[in-house]
């Protein structure tokens, strides 16, 4: 059984990460474990920037956005020699367990620490993209969804006033879950996501069909990287004759106080991660990751969830069908 654990946040920040850290710390202390907070993710692990945490270290954190431990992208961690330094830093402090909060890249780093150094690692899915396998939802997704929907509501006000077409670019990388959910909740007329082949002419045809039905304005929700928003706006305006403007929401989607569901999810996952570390699991095959499925906490080997065939969360086809019916 582990006696000392570390906790870090890695990759892009997500609302609810602080709540997850709090869940880990409070649950670990209740079990009599020592807890070290590692600053700036794997970079801090490599640079030996760790501090012992107590109950008061995480007071008033459940409602705060971002991550008070800090986060950083550290591609150098792929180097085995860099990982050896990180492992040495943990071994010298007697840390034998680690909770990593982040996406699939963060999971991969945790799995290597388990396989190469015997550290019992558990990953928690912290990303607004909802693109991690093994879980229905990730920490931060629902808060980002609220942010996007609020922006869509505001854009609808001005779009309807000017009978304009508005394009909203939503984060998500190669996963359209955030765009899809926001399109349904925001009543968007059109949607473009990575899971469905995107063609400009098809989108224009749909918009023209809407105009023919009497639509005076429209909101198009599109996942980042599918197209250049400014160029797409000009193309739509040229083809339809309707004024069209693009809005990139950007990093505002990552900020803000986490909504209640994210706080609950993060707290449950943090506590469950400690339970896993206290149980007599076999870590010879690698670390584990935590998820929520049908509102129940579950876990799986990290290697299974980051395998190429499982790396991305499943496409919510029923959500897409619903969205299309409501356009």
Curated annotation (Swiss-Prot):
Pfam families xrefs: PFK
Residues annotated to bind ADP: 22-26, 55-60, 156, 187-189, 213, 215-217
Main location (coarse class): cytoplasm
Residues involved in Mg(2+) binding: 104
Record-linked Gene3D superfamilies: 3.40.50.450, Phosphofructokinase domain
Subcellular location as annotated: Cytoplasm
GO molecular function term, any single one: ATP binding
Keywords for this protein: Allosteric enzyme, ATP-binding, Cytoplasm, Glycolysis, Kinase, Magnesium, Metal-binding, Nucleotide-binding, Transferase
Positions of ATP binding: 12, 73-74, 103-106
Cofactor (UniProt): Mg(2+)
Catalytic residues (UniProt): 129
Binding positions (substrate): 127-129, 164, 171-173, 224, 245, 251-254
Reaction catalysis annotation: beta-D-fructose 6-phosphate + ATP = beta-D-fructose 1,6-bisphosphate + ADP + H(+)
Assembly behavior: Homotetramer.
Family statement drawn from the similarity comment of this UniProt entry: Belongs to the phosphofructokinase type A (PFKA) family. ATP-dependent PFK group I subfamily. Prokaryotic clade 'B1' sub-subfamily.
Protein name: ATP-dependent 6-phosphofructokinase
Organism of provenance: Yersinia pseudotuberculosis serotype O:3 (strain YPIII)
Gene: pfkA
């Amino acid at each position: 059984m582990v006696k000392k654990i570390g906790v870090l946040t890695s990759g892009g920040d997500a609302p609810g990460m602080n709540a997850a850290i709090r869940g880990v710390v409070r649950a670990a202390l209740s079990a009599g474990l020592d807890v070290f907070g590692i600053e700036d993710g794997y970079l801090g692990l490599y640079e030996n920037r760790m501090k012992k945490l107590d109950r008061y270290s995480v007071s008033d954190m459940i409602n705060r956005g971002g991550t008070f431990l800090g986060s950083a992208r550290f591609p150098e961690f792929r180097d085995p020699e860099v990982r050896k330094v990180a492992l040495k830093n943990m071994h010298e402090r007697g840390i034998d367990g680690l909770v990593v909060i982040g996406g699939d890249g963060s999971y991969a780093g945790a799995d290597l620490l388990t396989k190469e150094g015997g550290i019992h690692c558990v990953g928690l899915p912290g990303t607004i993209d909802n693109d991690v396998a093994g879980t229905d939802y990730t920490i931060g997704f629902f808060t980002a969804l609220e942010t996007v929907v609020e922006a869509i509501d505001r854009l609808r006000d001005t779009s309807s006033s000017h009978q304009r077409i508005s394009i909203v670019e939503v984060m998500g990388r190669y996963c359209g879950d955030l765009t899809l959910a926001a399109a349904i909740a925001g009543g968007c007329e059109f949607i473009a996501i990575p899971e469905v082949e995107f063609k400009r002419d098809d989108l224009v045809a749909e918009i023209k069909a809407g105009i023919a039905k009497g639509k005076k304005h429209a909101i198009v929700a599109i996942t980042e990287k599918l197209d250049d928003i400014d160029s797409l706006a000009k193309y739509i305006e040229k083809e339809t004759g309707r004024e069209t403007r693009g809005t990139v929401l950007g990093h505002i989607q990552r900020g803000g106080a986490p909504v209640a569901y994210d706080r609950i999810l993060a707290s449950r996952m943090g506590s469950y991660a400690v339970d896993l570390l206290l149980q007599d699991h076999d870590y010879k095959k690698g670390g584990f990751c935590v998820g929520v499925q049908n509102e129940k906490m579950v876990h799986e080997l990290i290697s299974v969830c980051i395998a190429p065939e499982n790396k991305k969360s499943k496409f919510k086809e029923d959500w897409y069908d619903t969205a299309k019916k409501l356009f």
